[in-house]
């Protein structure tokens, strides 16, 4: 029997130092609006998560922590349950936030002035990981095809030169919500292989799919893609816990992992 959760009771988060509702005066000059600018929800987190946090608070000491086996095991179990994939523990790398992960990868795998391909419209903080690290953002606008968007591989080809080193992909795409198919991701894999590009993919919204659509993780496309892949994700969108600072990278290539550890 599946656990049922309450999506009817909306929590009033005003006057709680809420990054969504309590910043409206400063940002927009009014509180009389519905704020849709931040990707969190006004539903309570699952009771299992809240109970676990209560146990820590009831213990009373909020000291330094270390990564336990449970951290790695929870990710391994999730990928097994969702995708029937066995993820080796050593592939998993902790990172506080995906925005930090993307910035670390840009610093690690590229040099100042290098080009990084990213589809637009794009999630601002991922763009900043390129621009604030003094790299060149190679903008590839998505093409509208009927009711959905597509990647324009011909346009991407036209931008590549010897200084192009990486692609940053949102899968599913933010903000359009487009869920990339396996066939499209195979094209991405071929493109990155042909041009020797590192692929960073943000899959934080992968669990939030509309009925009838299944998330295609980049980890389950081709072995060649995995050799140049850094996948970043987090439980924060899935379980509505963005205030809990936790994310992770999955990096199958040992050489790429070691380079990240040095950074």
Predicted regions span which residues?
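A general structural signal for well-ordered alpha-helical segments in protein cores
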Residues: 46, 50, 71-72, 185, ...
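Conserved core segment of the aminotransferase class I/II
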Residues: 52, 222-263
